[in-house]
A protein has these predicted regions:
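General small-molecule cofactor/ligand-binding pocket signal
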Residues: 37-39, 76-80, 132-134
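Short, surface-exposed alpha-helical segments at coil->helix boundaries
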Residues: 51-62
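Small/aliphatic-rich secondary-structure junction motif
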Residues: 2-51
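Short, well-ordered secondary-structure micro-motifs
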Residues: 21-22, 48-51, 87-90, 113-115
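Structural beta-alpha unit
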Residues: 1-3, 17, 68-101, 108, ...
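Short glycine/serine/threonine/alanine-rich loop segments
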Residues: 32-35, 70-73, 129
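Glycine-rich, Arg-bearing micro-motifs that act as flexible, cationic patches
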Residues: 100-126, 139
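Active-site phosphate/pyrophosphate- and oxyanion-stabilizing loops and adjacent acidic/basic residues
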Residues: 26, 62, 90, 121
Length: 139
């Protein structure tokens, strides 16, 4: 790793686990001077209500980042078509400055009874950058 702060990508779907991931990533970004990119994946069936939901999600991310002390100019938002795993992999592939991917242990789909959701497991296996999976209730 170089002396330049990396960019941290964090997945956000509005779930409590995703909020914990944003808190963890924002705290790290504030402490290191890194940029923070929040990524929200939008599936085909979600497009109808995306405007209101995306605005609410963006405001939540901005509020959490502000509380952690992240400079507002260092926080960006990306809405990406596709399933959450594909969207996160696409963003990290298209943006070489991203050096860390942060996700919650389970997202909005929640597989009850499992410690990790399918997206976090798949990202841990397939991502080309380090992945931090924030456990439920942490951050």
């Amino acid at each position: 790793m170089t002396g330049t702060p990396l960019t941290i990508a964090v997945g956000f779907d509005g779930s409590p686990d995703a909020e914990a991931a944003v808190r963890w990533a924002a705290t790290l970004a504030a402490g290191t001077g890194a940029d923070l990119v929040a990524v929200h994946a939008v599936g085909l069936l979600e497009h109808a209500g995306i405007d209101g939901r995306a605005t609410a999600h963006r405001q939540t991310v901005e509020r959490i980042a502000d509380a952690a002390g992240v400079d507002p100019g260092r926080v960006t938002w990306s809405v990406v078509d596709g399933d959450p795993c594909s969207a996160m992999l696409r963003v990290t592939g298209e943006r070489p400055e991203i050096g860390l991917l942060v996700v919650g242990s389970r997202g909005a789909g929640r597989h009850h009874g499992s410690v990790l959701g399918s997206t976090s497991l798949e990202l841990a296996e397939r991502a080309h950058v380090p992945v931090t999976i924030v456990p439920t209730g942490r951050a």
